């Protein structure tokens, strides 16, 4: 291989509005203590009515491109992961975001892998770069999850937040600056555990069709049990495959879904406090944006430096899951 895929830059953006747990007491039977005890979440950010996922994503994307010392014209491919796209079916949020960046005549498409979206993005970007098809790939996890939440459902609306994270994946000849390994998987037999139904309307040919509300639905207990079991196995597999141990990893950056899930994986693998990146307490579950946002916070705090090895993992609707070993190739 002449070169490897490399994570050259990372950036993030969140809306300005902070929503604390206590604010849900206005319309739900809940409390700050109840939410934090079960999830580890203290607050989250919600976008305003005018903001869309692409608006959040484009701010993060511009900074990621700048940090990679590139311009939008240098980007060969744009891929966005989101469960809250700007439009129902088309155009893709990636196309909308590309236009806002001034990128023309370059491929752009979305990935639908829910909370595992960023791991899927890494897999796609790695393949495009290492095949020689692209030199610079912009990947963006952008979510306005508040647009798909049922604020009468205590089991879901307290969990999620809005935000975006973006990375530029480029080339390197150094293995220890590369996206070392990515593994992704799915099992559609559990698709009814976590889903957003499509709104169906009657037609002149099928007047019996019933409309459904397009809000995120989740079987929380079932998802929790499967997530812990699956992630433990997946993380052990990628470490063993690459002849690595938890102590070889500089930072463990899991999807920020729920503190209890993160803690279960962390304790099983015996990660130390300084190895684990946590942001769920202040942003909630930002789905496909959570890993790049957490990665960016670590970078901006000085915890992530060039050549550091990160272990990423995620689990989401589909059901989908995945993990990655990534050396930071930025500066």
From Swiss-Prot:
Keywords: Acyltransferase, Cytoplasm, Fatty acid biosynthesis, Fatty acid metabolism, Lipid biosynthesis, Lipid metabolism, Multifunctional enzyme, Transferase. Belongs to the thiolase-like superfamily. FabH family. The gene is fabH. Catalyzes the condensation reaction of fatty acid synthesis by the addition to an acyl acceptor of two carbons from malonyl-ACP. Catalyzes the first condensation reaction which initiates fatty acid synthesis and may therefore play a role in governing the total rate of fatty acid production. Possesses both acetoacetyl-ACP synthase and acetyl transacylase activities. Its substrate specificity determines the biosynthesis of branched-chain and/or straight-chain of fatty acids. Homodimer. It comes from Helicobacter pylori (strain Shi470). GO terms for cellular component: cytoplasm. GO terms for molecular function: 3-oxoacyl-[acyl-carrier-protein] synthase activity; beta-ketoacyl-acyl-carrier-protein synthase III activity. It is found in: Cytoplasm. The last Arg residue of the ACP-binding site is essential for the weak association between ACP/AcpP and FabH. Residues 256-260 are annotated as: ACP-binding. Its EC number is 2.3.1.180. Pfam families: ACP_syn_III (PF08545), ACP_syn_III_C (PF08541). Pathway: Lipid metabolism; fatty acid biosynthesis. InterPro entries: ACP_syn_III_C, ACP_syn_III_N, FabH, Thiolase-like. Its main location: cytoplasm. Signal peptide: none annotated. SUPFAM superfamilies: Thiolase-like. One of its GO terms (biological process) is secondary metabolite biosynthetic process. It is an enzyme of class 2 (transferase). NCBIfam families: fabH (TIGR00747), PRK09352.1 (NF006829). The active site is at 115, 255, 285. This is Beta-ketoacyl-[acyl-carrier-protein] synthase III. It catalyses: malonyl-[ACP] + acetyl-CoA + H(+) = 3-oxobutanoyl-[ACP] + CO2 + CoA.
């Amino acid at each position: 291989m002449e070169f490897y895929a490399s994570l050259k830059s990372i950036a993030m953006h969140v809306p300005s509005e902070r929503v604390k747990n206590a604010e849900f007491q206005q319309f739900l039977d809940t409390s700050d203590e109840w939410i934090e005890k079960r999830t580890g979440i203290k607050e989250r950010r919600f976008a305003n009515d005018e903001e869309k996922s692409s608006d959040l994503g484009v701010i993060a994307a511009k900074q990621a491109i700048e940090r990679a010392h590139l311009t939008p014209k240098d980007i060969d491919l744009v891929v966005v992961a989101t469960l809250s796209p700007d439009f129902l079916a088309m155009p893709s949020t990636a196309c909308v975001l590309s236009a806002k960046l001034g990128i023309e005549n370059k491929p752009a498409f979305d990935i639908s892998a829910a909370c595992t979206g960023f791991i899927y993005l890494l897999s796609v970007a790695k393949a495009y770069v290492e095949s020689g098809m692209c030199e610079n790939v912009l990947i963006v996890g952008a979510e306005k999850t508040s647009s798909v939440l049922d604020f009468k459902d205590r089991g879901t609306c307290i969990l999620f937040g809005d935000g975006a994270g973006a990375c530029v994946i480029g080339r390197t000849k150094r293995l220890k600056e590369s996206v070392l390994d990515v593994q992704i998987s799915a099992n559609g037999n559990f698709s009814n555990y976590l889903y957003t139904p499509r709104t169906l309307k009657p037609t002149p040919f099928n007047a019996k069709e019933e409309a459904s509300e397009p809000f995120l639905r989740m079987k929380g207990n079932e998802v929790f049990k499967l997530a812990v079991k699956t992630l433990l196995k997946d993380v052990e597999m990628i470490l063993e495959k690459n002849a690595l141990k938890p102590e070889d990893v500089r930072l463990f950056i899991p999807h920020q879904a729920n503190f209890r899930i993160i803690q279960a994986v962390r304790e099983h693998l015996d990660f130390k406090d300084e190895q684990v990146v946590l942001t769920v307490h202040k942003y909630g579950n930002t789905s496909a944006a959570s890993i790049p946002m957490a990665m960016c916070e670590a970078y901006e705090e000085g915890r992530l430096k060039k050549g550091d090895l990160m272990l990423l993992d995620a689990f989401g609707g589909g059901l989908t899951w995945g993990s990655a070993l990534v050396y930071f190739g930025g500066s």
